[in-house]
């Protein structure tokens, strides 16, 4: 046996012979930890109010998911949010009202989790982008019935207000570049800002995104007479889109109470839908899925996914009981024309049907969950744009020329 090192003998003797000194050292370390904790006390009033609001809103008894999923590396999360327009990566835009209108329909001032809304007054606020910036305007002005195409866009997770507004302008640049008709872009801006606890935020924002389905359903109800409506959802925003379509078609989501204002659109198969990196279970749109009726009034669905997505690769941790696979990681299955995919965890190439087109952007954008990477680097994003605009004859995968 190797002889004990001379340098370790005093430490061993200390542990064996001086229990009181060991206790004193332990108490001293505990005091240091307590002191460092008290150094940050008390928190400011705003943080206290924010936590109280979260506690009150979390009193809902509805169950949506059971556990968060984690990123592969700390840098795998989306890029940091923008706190001011001075830090924005979007230059000032001059929007021609004859071509496009850009609106923010916001629920950020409301509770982030809820089970019902007042269909006569849901409490949403509206802003329109003008030559002088974002200006408050009446919500009814955004929902007027005219001949403009209406595109409802729901952003993803970890988006502060300014970041979401900038994202709407980025999307508008792609749309206006290719559009042949006037359109009105309505972004549903929901409470999804990054908080100090990112893992808990993922869990909570997954619930919040599902609650936004009530607002998407309400918007579709208000636009039921409108002749031309498209929807786009990114990441968690896709939950709100498919959930809203499901509710609008008469479907029920456990834990939600939704009162429809109409019987749905007058014309069947009228909505065009596109999802980018959808953070929802790949079988939710199947006949037995949670949003089974989402495609009842949809003429076509385009899904862009990434089989190399480092975030959605861990999507199974969002519910440790069902261990779901994200449609944004492996595409949707169980739908008409896709019944042959019996293994929900299979990630092989998917067939294209007359109603559903799915494209893997992994080879183009690599290991990322960035929305802007899909827009700028996925060769199929122009298929999404032309699908939303109803310009299917132009829907060919080509490289974008938009720059920032």
Question: Predicted regions: what is each one?
Answer:
Residues 42-140, 144, 157-159, 165, ...:
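Lipolytic serine-hydrolase domain surface
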Residues 26-35:
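Bacterial N-terminal signal peptides
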């Amino acid at each position: 046996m190797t002889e004990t090192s001379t340098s370790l003998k005093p430490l061993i003797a200390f542990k064996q012979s001086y229990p009181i000194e060991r206790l004193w050292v332990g108490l001293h370390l505990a005091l240091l930890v307590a002191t460092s904790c008290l150094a940050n006390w008390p928190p400011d009033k705003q943080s206290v109010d924010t936590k109280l609001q979260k506690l009150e809103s979390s009193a809902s008894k509805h169950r949506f998911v059971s556990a968060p999923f984690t990123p592969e590396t700390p840098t795998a999360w989306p890029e940091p949010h923008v706190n001011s327009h001075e830090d924005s990566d979007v230059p000032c835009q001059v929007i021609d009202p004859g071509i496009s209108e850009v609106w923010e329909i916001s629920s950020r001032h409301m509770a982030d989790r809820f089970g019902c809304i007042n269909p006569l007054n849901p409490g949403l606020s509206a802003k329109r982008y003008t030559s002088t910036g974002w200006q408050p305007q009446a919500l009814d002005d955004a929902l007027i019935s005219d001949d403009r195409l209406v595109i409802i866009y729901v952003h993803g997770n970890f988006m502060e207000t300014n970041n979401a507004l900038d994202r709407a302008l980025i999307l508008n640049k792609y749309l206006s570049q290719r559009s042949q008709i006037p359109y009105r872009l309505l972004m549903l801006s929901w409470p999804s800002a990054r908080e100090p606890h990112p893992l808990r935020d993922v869990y909570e924002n997954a619930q919040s995104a599902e609650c936004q389905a009530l607002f998407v359903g309400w918007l579709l109800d208000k636009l039921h007479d409108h002749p031309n409506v498209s929807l786009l959802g990114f990441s968690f925003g896709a939950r709100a889109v498919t959930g809203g379509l499901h509710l609008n078609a008469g479907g029920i989501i456990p834990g939600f109470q939704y009162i429809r204002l109409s019987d749905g659109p007058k014309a069947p198969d009228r909505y065009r839908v596109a999802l980018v990196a959808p953070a929802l279970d790949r079988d939710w749109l199947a006949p037995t899925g949670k949003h089974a009726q989402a495609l009842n009034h949809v003429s076509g669905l385009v899904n862009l996914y990434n089989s190399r997505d480092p975030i959605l690769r861990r999507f199974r941790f969002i519910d440790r009981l069902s261990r779901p696979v994200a449609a944004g990681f492996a595409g949707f299955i169980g739908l008409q024309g896709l019944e042959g995919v019996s293994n929900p965890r299979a990630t092989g190439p998917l067939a294209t049907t007359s109603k559903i087109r799915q494209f893997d952007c992994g080879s183009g954008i690599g290991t990322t969950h960035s929305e802007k990477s899909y827009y700028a680097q996925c060769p199929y994003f122009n298929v999404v744009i032309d699908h939303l605009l109803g310009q299917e004859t132009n829907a060919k995968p080509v490289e974008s020329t938009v720059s920032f």
